[in-house]
Swiss-Prot record:
Protein family (similarity comment): Belongs to the HSP33 family.
Main location: cytoplasm
Cellular compartments annotated: Cytoplasm
Gene name linked to the record: hslO
Source superkingdom: Bacteria
Any one cellular-component term (Gene Ontology): cytoplasm
InterPro entries xrefs: Heat_shock_Hsp33, Heat_shock_Hsp33_C, Heat_shock_Hsp33_N
CDD domains: Hsp33
Species of the source: Trichodesmium erythraeum (strain IMS101)
Protein name: 33 kDa chaperonin
Protein purpose: Redox regulated molecular chaperone. Protects both thermally unfolding and oxidatively damaged proteins from irreversible aggregation. Plays an important role in the bacterial defense system toward oxidative stress.
Residues in the signal sequence: none
Length: 311
């Protein structure tokens, strides 16, 4: 199945459901960052979560940033996802590998760490982002984001995230988010039913691997609650907005002396994007042009010389 996101409603609009398949984009991230198995699972889960959270935003420019800072060896995890279906992300220590846990699965909680913080920023594109922070619950990503939604956004939610990776790469990845809308959020029994049903999807990646589609999984979860799956699926993909233009603009921050050293000692500059591992090379000629631009007299009017016009 192609990477995609689908939306649905149930219980007469009282339940919002979103599902996402992220197999190909998670494999692309694995290849770009040369991720270990455990790092692939962690970043894959977080990217799926980012797309699920971004799916409820309204303006086209809306984006969600998820930052996980645990005390595990994987270091920081950072994901940026948009309502437009694009996502990117990285982990600080992508090659870390750990032994399986007691039940033979990737030890995600140990890799991330269960002490630390989860930071989520929602930006609708107007310069007034909303941010929230909670302590990590388990480091498993799904538990931590569910905790955040309940505590910071007061939205009872049930979330399952999964990534299956083997020596051939990422075989399946994705997630499902069920949320109780405010008008029925006080119905604790409904919330418990959703939590129970999502818990039954502990083999979520196995279902995907066996060929189950998101609509079929939704039917199992919510088929007896007046399920209404919206007809249009949204394509999702790994996409970074880095560019050579942005790199050259960032190099201006180093100043004339440091840029001159890059020319003389390194014969240019190399910059790697953290989000996608794309390598950019700035030539001595390009650095020289930046130096010349920096040495040009500023045409801006100093703040002290600004004055109001009289009429």
């Amino acid at each position: 199945m192609a990477d995609q996101l689908i939306r649905a409603m149930a219980a007469e609009g009282g339940i919002r459901a979103v599902g996402v398949i992220t197999t190909r984009l998670t494999e692309e991230a694995r290849q770009r960052h040369k991720l270990s198995w455990v790092a692939s699972v962690v970043l894959g889960r977080t990217m799926a979560a980012g797309l699920l959270l971004a799916s409820s935003m309204k303006t086209p420019e809306s984006r969600v940033n998820i930052r996980v800072q645990g005390n595990g060896p994987l270091g920081e995890v950072l994901v940026d996802a948009g309502l437009d279906g694009t996502v990117r992300g990285y982990v600080n220590n992508p090659t870390i590998e750990l032994l399986p846990n007691k039940i033979g699965k990737h030890d995600i909680g140990k890799a991330v760490g269960n002490q630390g913080y989860l930071y989520i920023v929602r930006d609708i594109g107007y310069g007034y982002p909303y941010s929230g922070t909670v302590e990590l619950v388990s480091g498993e990503i799904g538990d931590d984001i569910t905790h955040y939604l309940a505590k910071s956004e007061q939205t009872p939610s049930a979330l399952v995230l999964g990534v299956f990776v083997d020596k051939e790469g990422v075989q399946t990845a994705g997630g499902i988010l069920l949320q109780v809308m405010p008008k029925v959020a006080i119905d604790e029994e409904l919330v418990q039913v959703l939590e129970s049903r999502i818990a039954s999807l502990s083999g979520f990646t196995s279902l995907l691997h066996s060929g189950k589609t998101l609509p079929e999984i939704f039917q199992e979860l919510l088929g007896d609650m007046g399920l209404n799956i919206l007809p249009e699926a949204q394509i999702v993909r790994f996409k970074c907005d880095c560019s050579m233009e942005k790199v050259l603009r960032a190099l201006r921050m180093f100043g004339v002396d440091e840029l001159q050293n890059m020319i003389e000692e390194d014969k240019g500059a190399e910059v790697t994007c953290e989000f996608c591992s794309q390598l950019y090379q700035a030539s001595p000629k390009e650095l020289t042009q930046i130096i010349q631009d920096l040495q040009q007299p500023s045409t801006e009017v100093p703040l002290g010389q600004l004055r109001r016009s009289s009429h």
